[in-house]
């Protein structure tokens, strides 16, 4: 005989899938469900937990349990979806410049004529060729930060760099402190490697470091993952005081710092990176996707010497080495000034797109940074982000909800709007459609 709670789960699942309970419907409270179904409160909680695991509902602390929009995949915004040609992509950031294709053609011609072309057919050192690591180290040198080429490891993009850091230095069950809203790609890594993410509350200016201090006093935290320069999705840039405080706290509690600098090169005059305040315990990860091109999968891990062998071993276990065809191309662009030129142009492009976003979304509670390629848009108290995302998809506009970025129990009703993928002339009309949809959702 089927367990009582299973029958309740099946009945609700059928009602949701058939549309009898439409997206956005608020379900009864746990106590009301328990009383109505004549089950215990613990069983009612189990019913909702199973429905949530099935991707049918989402529970939000303080608000209740709601039916998810089944036309959107769970975690909308995490998994790269195939976007139809007629869809305006405000979900992912693929910032590119018109002249980059011609520059790539010329770079490939130059590479083909280089004298060491045969070397690209052979295995290379796991961390990359030392000459290229030296070029990258000099490129990343800035105020208070001059990495040694020996500590630079070339990887297949910043995401691969994060994966190698996690794989090499952390173990299943380790507690990693992260912002309550954080980069969705790190959440995916944490799930794959069975890490426990502990959410640090977010303030407008950055993470609540007092809350991190309290967490470290109460639990054995192994590491902290941080995006101090152009945080994704909130766009903040931590000031020097916050960076020093984070470094001090990490020393006090012997934390590994994983500094994600994927967007850092887009900021004109950023503060010194966190690694400059705690070089002995910080792994610095960056790449060339956001400042150059997402398809050129070259990333960089800068590691303290004591951690380097473990990260290098992880590279060996996964990709052996980064293809030198691509790393050579990037290094040639660094040396001839192409990277610097593209970075300057990308900063200008991001600022122009932010200006358009500020103009179109004026009056809405937008959270962002002038150098960022995305904005965070909190919604009204009664608004439903999944319903709004679906309404926009019906208009052929793709956006991300807050769910992929959220680590805490309470999922905010908000949208992350990426500005970098659409042609500049298409951005304003797309954002006008977003504004119209948001206003309709608020006053429906």
Feature names for model-found ranges:
Residues 284-369:
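PLP-dependent aminotransferase class I/II
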């Amino acid at each position: 005989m089927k367990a009582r709670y299973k029958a309740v789960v099946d009945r609700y699942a059928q009602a949701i899938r058939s549309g009898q309970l439409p997206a956005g419907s608020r379900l009864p409270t746990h106590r009301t469900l328990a009383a109505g179904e004549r089950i215990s409160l613990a069983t009612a909680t189990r019913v909702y937990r199973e429905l949530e695991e099935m991707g049918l509902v989402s529970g939000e602390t303080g608000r209740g349990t709601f039916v998810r929009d089944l036309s959107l995949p769970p975690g909308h915004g995490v998994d790269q979806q195939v976007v139809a040609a007629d869809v305006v992509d405000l979900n992912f950031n693929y910032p590119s410049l018109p002249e980059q294709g011609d520059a790539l053609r010329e770079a490939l011609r130059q590479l083909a004529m280089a004298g060491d072309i045969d070397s690209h057919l052979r295995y290379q050192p796991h961390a990359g060729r030392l000459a290229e690591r030296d070029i990258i180290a000099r490129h990343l040198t800035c105020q208070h930060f001059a990495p040694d080429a020996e500590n630079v490891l070339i990887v297949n993009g910043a995401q691969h760099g994060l994966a190698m850091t996690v794989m090499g230095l952390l173990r299943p069950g380790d507690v990693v402190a992260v912002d309550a809203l954080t980069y969705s790609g790190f959440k995916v890594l944490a799930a794959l490697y069975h890490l426990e993410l502990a959410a640090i509350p977010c303030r407008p200016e950055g993470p609540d470091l007092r809350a991190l201090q309290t967490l470290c006093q109460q639990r054995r935290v192994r590491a902290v993952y941080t995006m101090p320069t152009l945080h994704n999705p909130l766009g903040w840039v931590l000031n020097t005081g916050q960076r020093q405080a984070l470094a001090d706290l990490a020393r006090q509690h012997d934390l590994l710092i994983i500094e994600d600098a994927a967007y850092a090169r887009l900021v004109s005059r950023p503060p010194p990176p966190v690694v400059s305040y705690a070089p002995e315990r910080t792994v610095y990860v960056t790449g060339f996707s956001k400042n150059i091109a997402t398809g050129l999968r070259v990333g960089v891990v800068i590691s303290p010497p004591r951690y380097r062998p473990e990260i290098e071993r992880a590279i060996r276990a996964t990709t052996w080495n980064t293809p030198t065809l691509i790393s050579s191309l990037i290094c040639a662009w660094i040396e001839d000034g192409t990277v610097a030129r593209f970075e300057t142009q990308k900063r200008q492009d991001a600022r122009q797109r932010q200006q358009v976003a500020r103009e179109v979304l004026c009056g809405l509670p937008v959270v962002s940074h002038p150098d960022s390629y995305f904005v965070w848009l909190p919604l009204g108290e009664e608004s439903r982000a999944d319903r709004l995302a679906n309404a926009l998809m019906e208009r052929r506009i793709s956006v991300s909800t807050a769910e992929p970025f959220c680590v805490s129990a309470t999922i905010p009703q908000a949208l992350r709007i990426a500005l970098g993928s659409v042609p500049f002339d298409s951005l304003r009309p797309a954002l006008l459609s977003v504004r119209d949809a948001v206003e309709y959702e608020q006053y429906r």
